[in-house]
């Protein structure tokens, strides 16, 4: 394959040879691969559980050797399940969880440590000290003054910039400060840094290709989306050498081919994309004002903002959705952690056997009998922004049953959805065109209906909820001419059900007020100062 087909007319003239595309998603809970045909039907699948490691309280890691074995295995298993041969795969698209990173030896390819997950809290004290530092105050003040004179959007964004534990930036600083082996390698220019996409690309090509894409780069906290390059300002501020960061390429791009030794044939790698941006693409949220609500391990609310970046003061941050040739699509995003995490935790406590049971359990009750759950195993994100908040149940009584606990957990997910949506309406001045949901938790009809009621909007749930896989496959398919253009993708999308408001938001007012009170009491719990 000599290069990408970026012109729709050029693609249309290409022979539409038979074949399949692979969409692979390395999520926070599972790693999944689907084989898609031209009708975007899943012909074969494989899934394995991602094994997160918890070496210390608040630390979350992934063993790269285990992840690599799983990655190769799910591709082989999915292709086998589809009943096809590897040489029938015309392109591979890879979607990955974002801001989870690793460093490795440039000469040997050996990693210095495990992947440090986006959920990891080891840098929480660094985040606190940096955000309260004199240097940050000077940085913000300087940017505000310069913005006053120049009216530059970029400087306005910089004046609001704060570090979070979810960004790669200060977790990488923590590694540089605490692992002498990495420090030495950086000094000797023998260190590679990469998020999961970069590392997989490096492994798949046996070290011959080192790169990331714009969607993944923009979620690290080290990228300048206005200049479309790594941020000299931020990297200088926290002393991370720019030479440590990989080249940034288009999302739909000919990154190279998988080394033949791995699968027996050189499969073209033609899309790298961050999971939320991939889900946005898979949902066909191509127009300004299109909204995606992903409920997986965490909840992510994204709105397509066209070609303009939107910075807010409350908690929506600008991202690059994807870059394909000259087209750059921007998103504004906010998130809430511990969505699927809370359900999984409840399952481990034997409140239910299968997550599918929770919908029926919640619907069997009129309400939670005043029980509130605060989903804060990894702190509370926007609009509360409290990394020291604790997860908690409040309002427990002798009459409280596991059914009340389960309903309270599901209600908390819907309440967080409402918080994010209200903040989006307040801060992003773009009319909402449509809302589409995906992720494992969107299979729960109770959460979906309650969210629809609370925000008073229709929410479309697709027939295929694995949108990150489909998005990666769609981007790969467009790159090789497997699909002609976005219009063709829109025609292939299938909706399963549209949830419409059935109750007025006011009917939830008392429950929402009680929950907000519980959240307030859970905040700042772990703060040592």
UniProtKB/Swiss-Prot annotation:
Pathway: Polyol metabolism; glycerol degradation via glycerol kinase pathway; sn-glycerol 3-phosphate from glycerol: step 1/1
Gene: GK5
Annotated EC: 2.7.1.30
Positions contributing to glycerol binding: 98, 275-276
Gene Ontology annotations of biological process type: glycerol catabolic process; glycerol metabolic process; glycerol-3-phosphate biosynthetic process; triglyceride metabolic process
Residues the entry annotates as binding ATP: 28-29, 297, 340, 440
Role summary: Skin-specific kinase that plays a key role in glycerol metabolism, catalyzing its phosphorylation to produce sn-glycerol 3-phosphate. Involved in skin-specific regulation of sterol regulatory element-binding protein (SREBP) processing and lipid biosynthesis.
Keyword entries, A-Z: ATP-binding, Cytoplasm, Glycerol metabolism, Kinase, Nucleotide-binding, Transferase
Spans through the membrane: none
Known catalytic reactions: glycerol + ATP = sn-glycerol 3-phosphate + ADP + H(+)
Entries under Gene3D superfamilies matching the protein: 3.30.420.40
GO molecular function: ATP binding; glycerol kinase activity
Name this protein carries in UniProt: Glycerol kinase 5
Compartment(s) where it occurs, according to its Swiss-Prot or TrEMBL record: Cytoplasm
Family named by the database record: Belongs to the FGGY kinase family.
Organism taxonomic ancestry: Eukaryota, Metazoa, Chordata, Craniata, Vertebrata
Keyword ATP-binding set for record: yes
Domain of life: Eukaryota
Keyword Nucleotide-binding: yes
One Gene Ontology term, aspect cellular component: cytoplasm
Signal peptide range: none
């Amino acid at each position: 394959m000599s290069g990408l087909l970026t012109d729709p007319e050029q693609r249309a003239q290409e022979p539409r040879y038979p074949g399949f595309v692979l969409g692979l998603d390395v999520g926070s809970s599972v790693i999944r691969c689907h084989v898609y045909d031209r009708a975007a039907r899943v012909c074969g699948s494989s899934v394995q559980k991602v094994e997160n490691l918890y070496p210390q309280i608040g630390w979350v890691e992934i063993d790269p050797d285990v992840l690599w074995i799983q990655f190769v295995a799910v591709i082989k298993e999915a292709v086998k399940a589809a009943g096809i041969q590897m040489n029938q795969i015309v392109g591979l698209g890879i979607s990955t969880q974002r801001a989870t990173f690793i460093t490795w030896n440039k000469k040997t390819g050996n990693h210095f440590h495990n992947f440090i997950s986006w959920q990891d809290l080891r840098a929480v004290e660094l985040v606190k000290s940096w955000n309260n530092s004199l240097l940050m105050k000077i940085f913000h003040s300087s940017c505000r003054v310069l913005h006053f004179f120049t009216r530059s959007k970029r400087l306005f964004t910089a004046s609001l910039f704060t570090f979070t534990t979810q960004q790669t930036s200060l977790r990488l600083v923590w590694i540089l400060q605490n692992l002498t082996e990495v420090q030495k390698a950086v000094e000797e220019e023998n260190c590679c840094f990469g998020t999961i996409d970069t590392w997989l690309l490096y492994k798949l090509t046996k070290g011959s290709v080192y790169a990331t894409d714009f969607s993944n780069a923009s979620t690290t906290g080290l990228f300048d989306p206005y200049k479309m390059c790594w941020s000299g300002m931020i990297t200088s501020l926290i002393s991370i050498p720019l030479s440590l960061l990989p080249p940034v390429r288009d999302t739909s791009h000919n990154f190279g081919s998988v080394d033949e030794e791995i699968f027996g044939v050189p499969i073209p790698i033609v899309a790298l994309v961050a999971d939320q941006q991939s889900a946005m693409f898979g949902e066909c949220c191509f127009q300004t004002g299109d909204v995606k609500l992903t409920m997986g391990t965490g909840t992510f609310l994204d709105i397509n903002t066209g070609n303009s970046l939107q910075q807010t003061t409350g908690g929506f941050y600008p991202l690059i959705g994807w870059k394909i040739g000259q087209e750059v699509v921007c998103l504004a995003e906010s998130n809430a952690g511990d969505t699927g995490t809370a359900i999984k935790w409840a399952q481990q406590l034997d409140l239910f056997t299968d997550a599918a049971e929770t919908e029926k359990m919640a619907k069997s009750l009129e309400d939670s009998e005043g029980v509130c759950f605060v989903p804060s195993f990894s702190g509370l994100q926007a609009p509360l922004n409290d990394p020291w908040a604790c997860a908690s149940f409040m309002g427990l009584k002798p009459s409280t049953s596991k059914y009340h606990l389960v309903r309270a957990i599901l209600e908390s997910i819907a309440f967080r959805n409402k918080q994010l949506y209200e903040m989006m309406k307040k801060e992003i001045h773009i009319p909402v065109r449509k809302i589409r949901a995906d992720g494992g938790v969107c299979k729960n009809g109770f959460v979906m209906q309650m969210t629809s009621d609370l925000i008073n909007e229709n929410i479309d749930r697709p027939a295929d909820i694995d949108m990150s896989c489909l998005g990666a496959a769609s981007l790969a398919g467009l790159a090789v001419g497997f699909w002609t253009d976005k219009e063709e993708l829109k025609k292939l999308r299938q909706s399963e059900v549209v949830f419409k408001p059935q109750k007025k938001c006011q009917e939830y007012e008392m429950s929402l007020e009680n929950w907000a009170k519980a959240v307030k009491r859970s905040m700042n719990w772990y703060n040592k100062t």
